[in-house]
Amino acid sequence: RNNLQISFGQNPSGSSINLEAEWFEHLRLLYRQSFERLESQGRIEEASFVLAELLQANAEAVNFLSKHGKFRLAAELAEARNLPKENVVRQWFLAGEKMRAVRIAILHNCFEYAVTKLEQENAETGAELREVWAESLAESGNYSAAVDVIWKLEKRRDRAKDWIEKTIEFGGAASARMLARKTILYPEKFNEIKEKFQEIIHDDRFEAIENRNAFARAVLKQTINDELRTLLRPLTRKILSDALKTSQSLALKEFRELVVMAKDGALRTDLPAFPQLALPSGATECFELVIAESDKGASVIYDACSLPDGKIAVALGEAGIKVLSRYGKTIAFFDQPAQKLVVSDFSNKAISLIKRGETVRLARIDFVERRAAFWCDAKLNVYTPNFDGNLWFIGLKDDFYAIDANAKNFEAVWRVPEVGGEVYSAIRTNKQVKFLTLSAKGFETWWYELPTLILRSRNERKWLDNAAESFLHIANISEGGHSVVIMQEQIQESTDWRFYANIFDYEHLCRRFDFPLDTVRFNRPDTFTQYAVVVAYSEQQATDYLFFGSGNQIATFHLVKARNVSTKFNENYLTISDDCGRILIYDFQNRILQQNLRL
């Protein structure tokens, strides 16, 4: 090249040179050193050239340019190199080219970030784009999400009439939610609504319980009218009856609020009995929930975590981070892109992460002060899903670190170097941190006591002993003695393969759990004390299996058409979110579905 200017086409393939892997890695290292030297000299555009043209690290180059205020160049590169459209929209907003960002959002159906930004700056323009977003969702057949999007525009709710009717006609939990909204929007059609409502009340099928819960939760989000209050009285009594039969009922707080809204004085005297009814009916009962393809929201949710008082923080990729009330109303927005959230033990702070090529962009969130700020770009392979507010543990290649989460830069205050294998996963409590390593010899667990950071044990895992012809697919450990190992084996007298989970208590195999034959992939198992959740994907759905202790299956969640599911434990709840805009909060201690929202 005659100069170090970025070309705005796809990365050229270049000449075909047959280099040994070690030479190629050496060349890549030289380029990386050149980038670091140019950055230290303040030659930002030349450094970004090395990233984009030589290392072909397009996402990292865009993030680097944006961090140094080269917003237009970052946007042009993001668009030219075909980065995710949400990132392109974000970069054009940062560059001040709002209408170009909007056009890309419309063209590629990635509205959320554009709508949020416009509504903050110009309510009228934001409302117009929100309407376009709703229309786009309706055209795709996602009618319930279209209603949710346009519902924030009170003057345009009439546009939702046809979408509401189509959702009600289709049936399911989404139908029940839309029936509640129809009662608010068209009270003059009360007789027609009441007839449909009676079907929900008198339906004795097991799945009808969730339909009644969906209607109730939709009501809790609204300012109700007399017609809706009339329906609430029989609904609350039916929900109380449901609680006698199953743990799949409303949370007590939700039920109490429903009774207050219904103004049912007689029922209020019966409320003290409700908490006992909400407990699991038996230790072996398995909670099961199926969410239909049509029952989804408008947002792509990458991660979610429960906060105090029923609030929920959701990571929306390039669209930033939202904090929702227990009823799904947005009460805070942080303009920091995020695919994962690492939450502090007190749930008042979080670290957000999003991949940018070989690096990860980190930001710090303060939920109490409602502020967020970019922290740094860092390299890490694995990390603990929580931190104590001060120290965050991460793994990079064969090193394990404790990072000062409050430092200006990404600073390690403690390190275990060269652990004899790649750091595979990590987990912590306030008393210990464990990490799992993988080498040619197999898996090994390292256990350090906190806060002393004293090594208490180091053990090889015997997961593959007596595994015959099976292959280890993915695994994780817990802070206790339990571990979950997903294995793959060939079906006898067949060319097909199947997956199963081995659940261990230390080295003792407690249970083998076979997955359906159409299962094709998994998330890494998520663990907490004696609980573990495994997310398994088929072509049609994602299924979340929740286990307790030595393999007792206590809950199953079927998320139809979900392609990316996130799970997160805290002391009381399992939070599940997916790329269809669904959020579930499950109380695994009492076996109750606390929240079931769509965003």
What are these regions (language model features)?
Residues R1-S299, D303-C305, A313-A315:
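Extended alpha-helical assembly domains of large eukaryotic scaffold proteins
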Residues A74-L77, L83-Q120, I351-Y401:
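A generic tandem-repeat structural signature
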Residues A78, A105, V314-E318, S352-E358, ...:
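Beta-strand C-termini and the immediately following turn/loop, strongest in propeller blades
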Residues S249-A283, K441, G480, Q492, ...:
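Sequence/structural signature of beta-propeller modules
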Residues K296-C305, D335-A350, C376-L391, L396, ...:
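Repeated scaffold domains used in trafficking and secretory/extracellular systems
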Residues S306-L324, K329-I331, Q339-R364, N386-G389, ...:
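Beta-strand-enriched, solvent-exposed domains that form extended recognition/catalytic surfaces
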Residues G310, G328, G389, K431, ...:
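Structural signal for glycine-centered tight turns and loop->strand junctions in beta-sheet-rich domains
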Residues G320-D335, T359-A378, D399-E422, G442-A468, ...:
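Surface-exposed loop/turn elements that mediate protein-protein interactions on large endomembrane-trafficking
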